[in-house]
């Protein structure tokens, strides 16, 4: 497929409530959308690093600039027949896996459309549906945390990821587990702890 056009959008989605994590509060979720066009088709990909490099070195504006000035020009007018070839073309750019992943996802979407095959089937999946989870921002009140978890379960989520920082307590997580013993739980600290805190997690 010869890449004839690339579409880039840096967007900010306002949130209903601030997104509280170990590295701070966000009023918006910023994303980079990448569209790769070939043969009259467009494949879409997205990445959503933080608006500033809080928990790793990437951030949304940086991903946009690299996409515009580096990754995009590298593949425009190129005939790309595999994801490995795409990866190889990007090899001179160090790191920046968020930005690269948006192009990779867009290429796979484009390839699936070209092949007229659902992407899940193209990459070896055997089920067109997957379970999704809910995310709950940092909470400092255990009752509110349990209420938010109950709301997620009532909406049909069988998996919940909890944002966690130093203002939270492990007793709160224990209270959630005791209230919902069958819930699949994930705790996301967003690089808010170091190896010096290892004993907290034992």
Predicted regions span which residues?
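Structured beta-strand/loop patches that form or line metal/cofactor-binding pockets in enzymes
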Residues: 1-55
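Short acidic, gly/pro-rich beta-turn/loop elements at beta-sheet edges
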Residues: 16, 44-46, 55-57, 142-144, ...
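Metal- or metallocofactor-binding catalytic centers and their adjacent structured scaffolds
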Residues: 36-37, 42-114
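Conserved active-site and cofactor/substrate-binding residues in soluble primary-metabolism enzymes
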Residues: 29, 62, 66, 81, ...
